[in-house]
Structure formats: structure tokens, C-alpha cells
Amino acid sequence: LKIGFIPITCATPLIMAHPLGFYSKQGLNVEVTKTAGWALIRDKMINKEYDATHFLSPMPLAISMGLGSNATPMNVATIQNVNGQAITLALKHKDNRDPKNWKGFKFAIPFEYSMHNFLLRYYLAEAGLNPDTDVQLRVVPPAEMVANLRAGNIDGFLGPDPFNQRAVYEEVGFIHVLTKDLWNGHPCCAFGTSTEFIQKNPNTFAALYRAVLTAAAMARDPKNRELIAKVIAPQAYLNQPEAVLTQ
């Protein structure tokens, strides 16, 4: 089986299930494949290049409805994480913390159909800004957000870890607000597959579900943080220093 993921900590359960042997314990031969961006995840699922994948939680609904792509029925198996995102700003804005003053700012978001887009729009609108006309919202793959912040191409981003912590680690940005302070308990990423895959392979899907759920239960316990950071840090997975992942 081929499972896609974006190299962010939201994908922790489905990534860690690979090195920790949770897939093989269910009798599955799984390849987890790092993917550059969310549009590519969508396209590879529609084209059946992936059997299952890491999704942004709004994506299965958007794909099923044909928003931004041909309509293809998709299902959410599990929500992989809640909260865990942040608005990170360039260091030059450290004294400009009031969003009312952010007219003209350029922000990166990972995808149109994302909680990141919805939460950033909500936050800006609460401050009296029109997200469509007063600021620029640009779709940028999460792995490119810190580089764009450093280059001055954007003023900030609402994105996933490890890239908020990476911006702090590299001293190019600071965390302005955590998304749990905008909506505590909000869903973020999901694990899912096509309706067709579930119907054709119900036992395989059930085994996949059990493997990811087992990993999620382990990831929920803070005492496992260091071990999990160690197994997801390598280049094949998140390609991040363990220090960034444990912060």
C-alpha cells in the first residue's frame, strides 16, 4: 500500500506507524511517501496513485464535492490532530501585534481548503479586516513557509508545526498566537481514503484504521514525545532536528 503525507507533525500517527511497526503488525506492507504539497496529495488520490493519505480535514469534503477538482468521493477515517497550529510573524513585526494594523500584509496558508485558511480569515475579520481585499493570502507548501518568511516574501503564515517552531529556531519569526486560542479543539488534519478503496478492500481498510488509531493513542501520551520525535525526525519523514520536534 502507498500512503501519502506532508512532512508536518500533524501526520505523526501515520508516519510513526511505519518505523514502529504498527502497519506490519496488522499484516500490511506499507510505503509512506513524502509529498510536496496538498494539491499533489489531492491529485494522487484522485488518480489512485495513493491508496490512502494524510489530508487536511476539509479536503475529503471538498474533493467529494468537486471543489477545485473533479468530484471523487473521499472518506475521513480519523481526525489525526486537534489544535497544534499557529500564526507566526516575521521578527520585524514583533512590535506590531495588533491585527488591526496588518492591512497590506502577505500571509501564507497551506491550501485553500484548510482550517488554516478558515482560522486566519476568521482572526482577520474579527479585527475588522477583509481577508480578500485588505491582505494577500498565498498558498505555500508548509516546508517553504520559513524560507519565504526569511526572504521577506511574506509577513507571516498560519501553518503547522514543525514550521512555527522552525521559524523560532532559525530566529526569523515568532509565534504570535496559537490556534487553540482562536478555537480550542479545532480539527486540523485527517487520515482518509477514497470511498471506492473502502468498498473494494474493507478488511485492508480496517487494518489500516487500526494501525493509525494505535499510533494516535500512543502519540496522545506526552511521555512518548521523545521517542516519537526520534522516529519521525529522519530525512525520509520530517527531516527536522529532534530539538525542533520536541519543543
Residue ranges and their predicted role:
Residues 155-160, 197-203, 207:
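A polyampholytic, Gly/Pro-enriched intrinsically disordered region
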Residues 106-110, 196-198, 216-220:
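Second-shell loop/turn segments in exported
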Residues 200-247:
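Secondary-structure end/capping motifs
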Residues 86-88, 190-193, 197-198:
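Short glycine- and hydrophobic/aromatic-rich loop-to-beta-strand nucleating segment
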Residues 1-139, 145-186:
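Short, glycine-/small- and polar/acidic-enriched structural segments
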Residues 144, 162-163, 193, 214-215:
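Short, hydrophobic/aromatic alpha-helical segments in well-folded domains
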